Curated annotation (Swiss-Prot):
Underlying gene: rpsP
Family indicated by similarity: Belongs to the bacterial ribosomal protein bS16 family.
Organism (species): Rhizobium etli (strain ATCC 51251 / DSM 11541 / JCM 21823 / NBRC 15573 / CFN 42)
GO MF annotations in UniProt: structural constituent of ribosome
Regions of compositional bias (Basic and acidic residues) in chain numbering: 99-110
Name of the protein this chain belongs to: Small ribosomal subunit protein bS16
Database matches in InterPro entries: Ribosomal_bS16 (IPR000307), Ribosomal_bS16_dom_sf (IPR023803)
GO biological process: translation
Pfam families: Ribosomal_S16 (PF00886)
Amino acid sequence: MALKIRLARGGSKKRPYYHVVLADARSPRDGRFLENLGSWNPMLAKDDEKRVQLNAERIKHWLDNGAQPTDRVLRFLNEAGVAKREAKNNPIKAKPGKRAQERAAEKAQKAADAAAAADAAE
């Protein structure tokens, strides 16, 4: 059984509230879970201490027993000092796409042609 530490949504419409739960990876997002490990209230201010509440002792226990946190939960665990989140580095993502590079090359070519025409006219 693959275990995940993930968020289960609660609250009402447009007023989200999430429980940090340990669940089987195959169960639905808000479905059956094994243990409630904390909560996250995104409606509170970012510096509010009650915004993210975690049971660090139980989370460490489950991480040691093979549970995998989701990306968002891993961010919370990294902030709390419970688990280490590796920074992702994707230098290719910052590069413009193929079409954008073609448009930039065309624009540079037109500017060079215009400069050459202006020099020839003088």
